[in-house]
Amino acid sequence: MPDHAPSPLQTRLAKEITGDVLFDRFSLGRYATDASFYQIMPAGVVVPRNMDEALRALAIARDDGRIVTARGGGTSQCGQTVNNGIVIDFSKHLNRILSLDVENRTCVVEPGIVLDDLNRQLKKHGLWFPVDVSTASRATIGGMAGNNSCGGRSLRYGTMR
């Protein structure tokens, strides 16, 4: 049984997004925290199946006047992944390497790919991504870019800029 009657925002998102559209208290509670001490209940969560759905969710949230936060692994220690608007979680479906150019040492990835997973795939080609956050088994590239993450190798290899 639903926690409450669906809002117009929830109804529209559910109609236009095939990925998960979460407005129940349990799901919202899971997204109300990250690795920080902040706890902010979001209005809703969207887990898009592809980038078109992510863009659609963003447009719907904008039409409704909601703030939006992109979320990956939720490993932020400063509360960047929590808000009282709409959270778009990229970690479930948008987590692949889209292209890899070994010769030029470049790749294009989706925002939800986990750093350790990326490096496992790059290692097969003698490559690696040198930003070494302590949460590499859970941190996503999108979240790392949003935070300008760095690590012990940042003096030599730089940050996410």
Feature roles, as predicted:
Residues F26, S134-A136:
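Active-site beta-loop-alpha junctions enriched in small/polar residues
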Residues M1-A35, M41, I60-V68:
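N-terminal accessory segments
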Residues A35-S36, Q77-V82:
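Short glycine-biased active-site loop of nucleotidyltransferases that positions the nucleotide triphosphate
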Residues L13, S36-V68, I86, F90-V133, ...:
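N-terminal glycine-rich flavin-associated loop
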Residues R138-G142:
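Beta-rich nucleic-acid/ligand-interaction surfaces
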Residues R71:
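Conserved PLP cofactor-binding pocket of PLP-dependent enzymes
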